[in-house]
């Protein structure tokens, strides 16, 4: 810990000061709020946004760590993030930011979003709530009722390499999952240029346990996954 303190003090966080990064509160900064900032996806999102010269994170939401310093949860954020974690009050958050990211389990974003919120901010959801256009398929797969089916049609699948212009205009962006992203980006250019036969495609994709989230589960224990592989689908 002492070594890390010396390291950060000597370098003074160059990644956040170079490349023309604006100062906190400076005009033109995009104010972002994150609900679910302490999960694995949320933590990675924080890291990426902290390195963006035009973004300022105003809200670190976490049900599990309300009023605790974010850097006490992710110690690699020591001297980078001084904020404490807040709740998931999306209506209040919409009054304070320009864009809301939800890095939460399936069902939460759909239960929180409403017309008033969408009139104020853009919502980028990292869960599956708005990826699947067929409500019945979503409910069968995730075993939950979809709370906001009225927004599914307008949600844009946020694969920016393909839907860049639509993402810019969308009120709700459904961030793609890991398997569809790696599969689509690999295959799309080949199909677009008619270089392969779509009927011959076989996708063999594997994920580490971080893809299952940060919550404790027997299936994700070290003794269960070490030197092991489990098929699912």
Where on the chain are the PLM-derived regions?
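N-terminal Rossmann-like NAD(P) cofactor-binding subdomain of oxidoreductases
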Residues: 13-16, 21-233
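Short, small-residue-biased leader/transition segments that mark boundaries at the very start
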Residues: 1-7
